[in-house]
Amino acid sequence: MNQWVSVDLFAGAGGASTGLRCAGLEHAVCVEWDEDAAKSLKAAGFPAVHGDVRDLSHYEDIERVDLLWASPPCQAFSTAGERKGALDERNGWPWTLDIIDHLQSRGIGPRYVMCENVPGLTYHKADCTGDVEQCPGCYWEGWIIPEFKKRFDWVGHMMLDAADYGVPQHRRRIFLVAGEGPVKWPSPTHGPPNIALQGTMFGSPVKPWKTIRDALGMEKFIGGGRNPTPRENDKRTYRDITNEPSTTVAAVTIGNAGPFVAQPGSEPWRLDKPSPAVTCRDDKGARHQKFDPSKTPMTAADATWRAAGVRRLTWRECAKLQAFPDDYPFEGRTKKSLYRQVGNAVCPPIAEILGRMIIDALEQ
């Protein structure tokens, strides 16, 4: 049996690394700039390097790379920010390609590359003029994809929602794969309860979405008004509106972002659905409103879990919505750091599924 070797760039606290390890890949190195996140990586047993991914000395002892995973900083492209795109100083795509060139020049791979980023990377600006330096969508179509096609025989990409693969959170991300040949993208394993039922009856079965209640066990927050326990004639209403995953966990630490959980006596949120986009901020704001799950959540302030009477989810609760193991050894000197690490992470189950997909391609 082959031992497949991976390199993790912009590794954060280890979400992708954890998933890839579960899939059966062995890490040669995991590089992360943030000191606390690098400590978390090391505590979790990964070969962590605290440093700049552009420092090529980090890769000198590597003899083979089967998969290079990269999660370049998303702030340059997120719809929650200014979307400076290619000109943003945090744009890590050129750095990723430089590392690929370095490894290929030594003849050690990578055989496949997996890159993860926010959907906003693929969206065109309203005032788009076709300039790849000014419009993220043009940068994606006119520079990123062509640059990978120069280096690999096959390039593909797909948007995935973590909730469709067993994570109790709606977290949409674009995944780019480049390598020796096509991959077979994973089919969803979970879906809305009605789709799950139809699938069982008429096609490939999927399980119902995992929910906030599944992850956090918050039965006591179903109550409404001043009474934390709904009246008998309210039970159907509250049951019917409580079926949803969380929204995306993000990593900003200012403003009035959630996620929040209703305090006893407050109006309930949809606990029996996947969480909305959970923003990992230390909440200091005063504006709280109910999140409208019918709207597409953004990564920052709009992508929150809010209610009339609220408390901020703890960073450990956020980690549960990211589907980290309960005992994952996050290291951090401040709550701000811990929230940021959790919110920046790739959901481990998604990385595991995609890691298995890459292994299947490697074994062809």
Predicted segment positions?
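Conserved SAM-binding strand-loop segment of SAM-dependent methyltransferases
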Residues: 46-52
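Conserved SAM-binding loop
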Residues: 41
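Class I SAM-dependent methyltransferase "Motif I" SAM/SAH-binding loop
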Residues: 9-13
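Acidic-aromatic/histidine active-site loop/patch
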Residues: 351
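Short beta-strand element of Class I
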Residues: 27-28
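Class I S-adenosyl-L-methionine
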Residues: 56-67, 74-283, 292-302
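Conserved acidic E/D residue at the C-terminus of a beta-strand in Rossmann-like folds
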Residues: 31-34, 116-117
